[in-house]
Amino acid sequence: MNLRPLAPLLLTLLAGCSQQPPLRGSGDLGVLIERADGSVQILDGTAKTSLARVEGLGDLSHASLVFSRDQRYAYVFGRDGGLTKLDLLAQRIDKRLIQGGNSIGGAISQDGRLVAVSNYEPGGVKVFDSRTLELVAEIPATRLPGQDRNSRVVGLVDAPGQRFVFSLFDSGEIWIADFSQGDTPHLTRFRDIGKQPYDALISPDGRYYMAGLFGEDGMAQLDLWHPERGVRRVLGDYGRGQRKLPVYKMPHLEGWTIASDQAFVPAVGHHQVLVLDARDWKQTDAIDVAGQPVFVMTRPDDRQIWVNFAYPDNDKVQVIDSETHEVIETLRPGPGVLHMEFSGRGDQVWISVRDADQLQVWDPYRLKRIGSLPARSPSGIFFSHRAQHIGL
């Protein structure tokens, strides 16, 4: 048999195989947002290295992402309305589309089949098939009286029961979109929940949806076990207060953290972390810290609380003992600390240091830096273990 005619084909196939990333799992992979360049890095959490840089993801100035349930794909939500499906194993963009004019986040459904995006323009939520990115449903937000636009949508999260929950900033509402019966959602609307809900979170057990209010103090809470009870106001003093203090950056409500029966919350405009009883949502303590907190995050064993800060204190990270509420260490990773992310079992914490163009890895037990990678204006850090958690 003469194999000579097949030789060029075999060489081509072998060359193609040599260019593929090696076979591996995806459980320890992460994604770093490089906000200035519209690029991301794919991270190896075990080796503490960068596997690849993927470019062409558009405006990532306020980007976030979620993971597919098999942890192979990341869905990146860009500020320019871009929705990008990123293949972490092939290290490339799988699919990408521009679905709106100005987006502010997204979520993936409980069964992993649907990806939802919240939009400022056009105001509303669009829901896509996670495999094909084909449009499944479009949910326009409330039309604003006398204006040619809809309310902006914020605080979109997934909830148990194949539901999405989100807030309407301009019209002061919370909506539940229930997809449990198919691709046409059943909508439940809660009106007059407070002025200008600007962000929201869902508790780790998926029971409570909490919306922060920009236009007044307090928070709006919806019990998803008993939505028939409506929205109630909690934490009446939470906010900027009667004396309007300068707020250098509104804290992300997704940066709240719950450790055992305590919730640790960044105070707005104050150099404090508030401690709440997570059973009745009443304040029990206030911890003085180095600046205005942005993200307050718990180590996965709940023993420590890590806090970063708005300018001009954004070169620091403080570590709080969750039992005594004492600040046990002040770290100085460098200028422009934007985000932190723990590994799934808590042996590492990754810190983005924007103004130093660095991504740092720290040992949260010894409180020592154990690695550093170059990065272009790094911001959000997301590891694939998030795929198995409600609201992440």
Swiss-Prot record:
It is found in: Cytoplasm. Disulfide bonds: none annotated. GO terms for cellular component: cytoplasm. Keywords: Cytoplasm. Gene3D superfamilies: C-terminal (heme d1) domain of cytochrome cd1-nitrite reductase. Pfam families: Cytochrom_D1. InterPro entries: Cyt_cd1_C_sf, Haem_d1_sf, Host-pathogen_enzymatic-act. Required for the biosynthesis of heme d1 of nitrite reductase. Could have a dehydrogenase activity yielding sirohydrochlorin from precorrin-2 or dehydrogenation of propionate side chain C17. This is Protein NirF. It comes from Pseudomonas aeruginosa (strain ATCC 15692 / DSM 22644 / CIP 104116 / JCM 14847 / LMG 12228 / 1C / PRS 101 / PAO1). The gene is nirF.
